[in-house]
From Swiss-Prot:
Motif Nuclear export signal in this chain: 109-122
Protein name: Protein Rev
PTM comment, free text: Phosphorylated.
Gene: rev
Domain notes: The RNA-binding motif binds to the RRE present in incompletely spliced viral pre-mRNAs. This region also contains the NLS which mediates nuclear localization. These overlapping functions prevent Rev bound to RRE from undesirable return to the nucleus. When Rev binds the RRE, the NLS becomes masked while the NES remains accessible.
GO cellular component, one term: host cell cytoplasm
């Protein structure tokens, strides 16, 4: 039995080689394309012919493989790129650019640190100002609101602004009301302490009355 099996192997190999040669000749003569030859090989159930049947000129993998001659079909492979060889001066130029960028970054950081130190000094000067706004030790240029009440400066500013009362009726804060459509003073609103949601939008009363409805 073993001998019979061994005898059958060469015959099968011969059949396979004959089929392969016939298909290869048909491809070489142009009677069949490589794809048709592969399909016939698969239909005849002779195994995968990818590594045995040579592709025709129309289905070549690359020009380089055509120049080298016959090679089995192994699919499309990207060509290997040669390693990039840089000129020696390239690395020196690159180091110079990197060092220059680092130097610029250090200069920017030093400028920012100096600016922060200057702002800290000014903040310390502002903190030295007492609640009355008088401090002989503080420099003359440092004019700022007191640290105890940050709204004192805005209150003093609005208190100096001129108020014009154009109406006789009193509004809900006990002050003479303005004519319809006139703006409300910011100082009146801050000193009143009344509901913030009830203030008209844009600081103005609706036309037709001194007080909001």
């Amino acid at each position: 039995m073993m001998e019979e099996g061994r005898k059958e192997e060469p015959e099968e190999r011969g059949e396979k080689s004959t089929m392969r040669d016939l298909l290869q000749r048909a491809v070489d003569k142009g009677h069949l394309t490589a794809r048709e030859a592969l399909d016939r090989w698969t239909l005849e159930d002779h195994g995968p012919p990818v590594h045995h049947v040579k592709l025709g000129r129309s289905n070549t993998v690359s020009i380089a493989e055509c120049a080298r001659g016959y090679r089995p079909c192994r699919g499309r492979r990207p060509a290997r790129r040669p390693p990039i060889r840089r000129h020696p001066s390239f690395w020196g130029t690159l180091r110079g650019l990197v060092s220059e960028a680092q130097r610029r970054q250090e200069d920017r950081m030093s400028d920012l640190e100096n600016r922060m130190a200057e702002l800290e000094e000014r903040f310390e000067d502002l903190a030295l100002v007492d609640s009355g706004g008088k401090n002989p030790a503080a420099p003359a240029q440092s004019v700022s609101p007191p640290s105890s009440n940050p709204f004192a400066y805005s209150l003093s500013h609005f208190s100096k602004s001129k108020r014009v009362d154009c109406g006789e009726k009193g509004n809900r804060w006990g002050r003479p009301g303005a004519f319809p459509g006139a703006g409300i003073s910011e100082l009146d609103w801050i000193e009143s302490g009344d509901g913030g949601d009830e203030r008209p939008k844009g600081g103005r009363y609706p036309r037709g009355g001194n007080t909001p409805s």
